[in-house]
Amino acid sequence: MVNLGKDTYPVYIGSNLLEISNIFFPIESNTQVAIITNDVVFKIWNKKITYYLHKLGAQVKNVIISDGEIYKNIDTVEIILSTLLKYSYCRDAVLIALGGGVIGDITGFVASIYQRGIKFVQIPTTLLAQVDASIGGKTSVNHVLGKNMIGSFWQPSSVIINFDFLNTLPRRQLISGIAEIVKYAVSFDVNFFNWLEENLERVLKLDYSALSYCINRCCEIKISIVEKDEKEIHDRMLLNLGHTYGHAIETFLGYGTWLHGEAVSVGIVMASKTSELLGFMKDNDITRIISLLQRVGLPISGPKNMSFESYISNFKRDKKVISGKLRMVLPVFIGNVKIFSNVHENILMSVIKNC
């Protein structure tokens, strides 16, 4: 449960969740439902989701968009809005985000602006979305000049994290999601990091108990922080380890060239080395982080053709910038992160040059 007063909502985690009778709250008989999904997920899972919704008596339409970060933009928002208007969806309609982080972000954003706000349900189908993006109410689309620059805070009515979806997840997407798991461990829980070092192969093999532990632990951390700081005034920024460097890489390369977790992986390494130059992170901790990321199969170095100037120009549009001052989330040691302001450009240049 995410306790946010009037915006409190349940988070269901497990297998075979779709068979639970009240799992699709607040959907009931005659509710107008629009399933927002992509062409890949639609082929595999839509029939099953629709079956259970029809059993409830819901009126269901599908809005199918192309798969990929490149489609997370205002044009896609227009397509979804036009569909809702075409079929006269009312303010008591419910949207379902059936997909990964891209689908969840777009659907939440549409829900926040359609007729000044309607309800939506998150059904994340990727590991990355299950451990991070589906919880907390951040919604957004990208702009050509920056990732997630157009968005809002709009909490879902419920989140359904069903492990069964991971059985059909492409390997690259699975590996990308593990980057966010590593982020949580490095940022908040050294015991979790130690556990990952010992049990990584079980996670990669989709061992049920290992996945359950990882997903539950990440969600516990995320929920505890969101409950304290829903709108990212301070504490919630700590969830952004690796994202300043990572978002810059994604924007430079073009959305979708690298998956989000791949960029975050490099961002975690760069943030760790930035902290080391500031006198905090120890070399042994950085070695352990790099070793774990390499075992996962994630990149640890940025694009060779990305210049220092390209990083800096993207940093200036980072959402953590306040009054022109860049704030970065950096690890102090494994299990602890802090926000640093105005890291000197010479340090940033050294990190970028050597990563």
Curated annotation (Swiss-Prot):
Q: Where does Zn(2+) bind?
A: E180, H243, H260
**KW Protein transport (keyword) present:** no
Matches recorded under InterPro entries: Dehydroquinate_synthase (IPR050071), DHQ_synth_AroB (IPR016037), DHQ_synth_fam (IPR030963), DHQS/DOIS_N (IPR030960), DHQS_C (IPR056179)
Compartments where located = Cytoplasm
Q: What is its EC number?
A: 4.2.3.4
Q: Which GO terms describe its molecular function?
A: 3-dehydroquinate synthase activity; metal ion binding; nucleotide binding
* Lipid metabolism in keyword set: no
What does the UniProt record say this protein does? Catalyzes the conversion of 3-deoxy-D-arabino-heptulosonate 7-phosphate (DAHP) to dehydroquinate (DHQ).
Under what name is this protein listed?
3-dehydroquinate synthase
Which species is the source of this protein?
Buchnera aphidicola subsp. Baizongia pistaciae (strain Bp)
- The UniProt gene name for this protein comes to aroB
